[in-house]
Amino acid sequence: MGAAFSYLTSEIRFASPSRLDGAGAASRDADCAAAYLTISDDAIDGAEGHGFVFSAGGSGDVQLAAIEAVMAIIEDRRLDSLLADMGETWRTLVDHTRRGWLAPDGGLAHRAAGAVINALWDLKAKRAGLPLWRLLAGMPSAEIVRLVDFRYLSDALSAEEALAILEAVLPHRAQRERRLLAEGYPAAAASPGELWYSDELLERLCREAMADGFTQIKLKVGANLVDDRRRLAIAREVCGPDIAIAVDADRRWGVDEAVGWISALSEFDLHWVEDPTSPVDLLGHAAIAHAVTPVPIATGEHALSPVMVKQLLQLNAIGYLQIDATAVNENIASLLLAAGTGVPVCPRAGGAGLSEVVQHLAMFDYIAVSGSMEGRAIEHVDRYHEHFVTPAEVRDGRYRAPLFPGSGAEMLPTSLGDHMWPMLSALDGVA
């Protein structure tokens, strides 16, 4: 019997408010794009799950083709069976022989599988009438463990060790949920320090971030060392010693250049240096981290799979792990790996829809995995939220726990129509 669901894919593009908002030292392409997937439950009118693959600029047509190929793997499955065992569904998506040779554990096909599983998670949470963070945090520990594929992780973390991590924090889950609902989750302001902002704008945005309750900000760096030192001096003078200042190099440097550049900036008491070099150079990250100690290195948004996260942690290459709005199952694996080594997780959220999704993962981590918000923050960029049905809410420098069912990935129908490529009405001149 055929599966009782249908699906639709769309390429979505947004122009940044300024052509340089969100641009980094390695790329001045700040436009956001997404390959967007909607899975509809044909048995229940209006029941939909939404997932996407985020990117900058174009190339969505290639990613959409990958999503179509992955959807073909499950087109003959019943929706109920897919949702009943999300661990097995994930393994089906990533292990199928049709795509096993296409960059296993990474690449376009793997990213596409992430969009598919996330759309299913969105639908599962909506069926349960729960926000995703609460659905995950309410699962028994053994069920959470079954969501993770430990084949390539067990040399660092076994299923039994993962279960022990979850069981250790289980007794106070309800207490932590009450605290989350009352206080929210720390947010880090990424908007003040865009690389191409004037000194005057940098100063003003730093003051506004502090007035809004943020205790951490981020500056982009890496284009010019003299400029970076001047901008950091301004930010530190404005913010004082009690505001954490992180910097993001956007993969700009080679290893030796990174060590020299970071050393030249270290006097400004850097909270971390993000993405200093190629995301696939794990040994390079380790070399940088060891050379610039005690300045922490943060990375992970470009990690192709939890296997890379495992290796970064084994190499002591990072002081902070940054996850992104990628496959829920793999993010759970990464959260468990980080908890097992005591490394804080600070999700990246610098694009359309990322805040809406990663907040659920961070809140699940606090309640059910690490049990801590200490030294943690979710990145916040004040752009694109108006395009989503349940936009992320940040007040007094903290994310407020979303209470609407789902993962937060669902876009407004009007925004989907206005920003669909190539039929755009609100985005002119972007190719």
Q: Positions of the model-derived regions?
A:
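Short glycine/serine/threonine/alanine-rich loop segments
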Residues: 76, 130, 295, 343, ...
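Ligand-binding pocket scaffold of soluble enzyme catalytic domains
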Residues: 50, 341-344, 384
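Catalytic core of soluble alpha/beta enzymes
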Residues: 218-356
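Buried hydrophobic packing segments
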Residues: 116, 120-124, 334, 357-362
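Glycine-rich beta-alpha junction loops
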Residues: 13, 56, 327, 350-354, ...
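Flexible, glycine/charged-enriched surface loops at secondary-structure junctions
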Residues: 82-83, 132-135, 220, 272-276, ...
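N-terminal capping/lid subdomain adjacent to the active-site entrance of alpha/beta enzymes
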Residues: 2-245, 250-252, 256-259, 263-266, ...
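Active-site pocket-lining/capping segments in soluble small-molecule metabolic enzymes
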Residues: 173-178, 356-395, 404-406
